[in-house]
């Protein structure tokens, strides 16, 4: 961790030093910078060629011969042949190279797949995420018939749970309660859409199965959350990082 911090400090110092040197370099001048304009354009107060605001002989508004408004021959308003209002051939007002416009950027399938693999928030579920697949636990329900029924039908029950980040809950019970409700609701709706219905026994067993998986999901997410906070605290409390932050503040303020 210390070596990484020193490398980060060296990288930022080199970067900001280069930026400071770039700011002090004089700006390169272009051709004819600060002088007169391109030959033939003239200065704002000088003469221009050809004269502005008028045309040649027989051109009251700057068009060619017989062109009262600046169009081609037989074009009263500046369009092409057969174009009364300035469009391209066969176009009533647009430009003539519509097909030369750049194509709209397409969404990369690689980006979409990457977002899905990263566990993005499930659309339409108000910020819920879908956990990774789990093995369904072996449960006992107090009698042989229910135990046998569970073993025969356990593959019909969820093996993934929906949940929100653990920092949105005060304790494990609230997390598990919310996790069980949304998971069973989503699973039953999806399965019913496929033409399969659940009995009261199925719902009872699903509640037990999903509860166990939600507890496991909470423990996993809590551990990851606290590990992340501890790592951040250790990183930002190390002397090299504190020195780096102080140096950046000095550069920004100064």
Curated annotation (Swiss-Prot):
Gene Ontology cellular-component annotations:
Golgi apparatus; plasma membrane; side of membrane
Q: Which SMART domains match?
A: PRP (SM00157)
The name on file for this protein is Major prion protein
Give the organism the record lists: Nothocricetulus migratorius (Gray dwarf hamster)
- Region (5 X 8 AA tandem repeats of P-H-G-G-G-W-G-Q) location: 51-91
**Residues annotated to bind Cu(2+) 1:** 61-63
- Give the matching PROSITE patterns: PRION_1, PRION_2
Q: Which SUPFAM superfamilies match?
A: Prion-like
């Amino acid at each position: 961790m210390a070596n990484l911090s020193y490398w980060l400090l060296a990288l930022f110092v080199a970067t900001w030093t280069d930026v400071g040197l770039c700011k002090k370099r004089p700006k390169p001048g272009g051709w004819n910078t600060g002088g007169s304009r391109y030959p033939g354009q003239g200065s704002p107060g000088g003469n221009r060629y050809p004269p502005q605001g008028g045309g040649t002989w027989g051109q009251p508004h700057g068009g060619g011969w017989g062109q009262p408004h600046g169009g081609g021959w037989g074009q009263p308003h500046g369009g092409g042949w057969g174009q009364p209002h300035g469009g391209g051939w066969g176009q009533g007002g647009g430009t003539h190279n519509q097909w030369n416009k750049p194509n709209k950027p397409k969404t990369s399938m690689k980006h979409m797949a990457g977002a899905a693999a990263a566990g993005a928030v499930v659309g339409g579920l108000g910020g819920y995420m879908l956990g990774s697949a789990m093995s369904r636990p072996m449960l006992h329900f107090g009698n042989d018939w229910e135990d046998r029924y569970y073993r025969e039908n356990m593959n019909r029950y969820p093996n993934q749970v929906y949940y929100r980040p653990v920092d949105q809950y005060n304790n494990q019970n609230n997390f598990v309660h919310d996790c069980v409700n949304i998971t069973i609701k989503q699973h039953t709706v999806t399965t019913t859409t496929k033409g399969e219905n659940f009995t009261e026994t199925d719902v009872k067993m699903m509640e037990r199965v999903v509860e166990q998986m939600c507890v496991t999901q909470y423990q996993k997410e809590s551990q990851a959350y606290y590990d992340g906070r501890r790592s951040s605290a250790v990183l930002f409390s190390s002397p090299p990082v504190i020195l780096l932050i102080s140096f950046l503040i000095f550069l920004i303020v100064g």
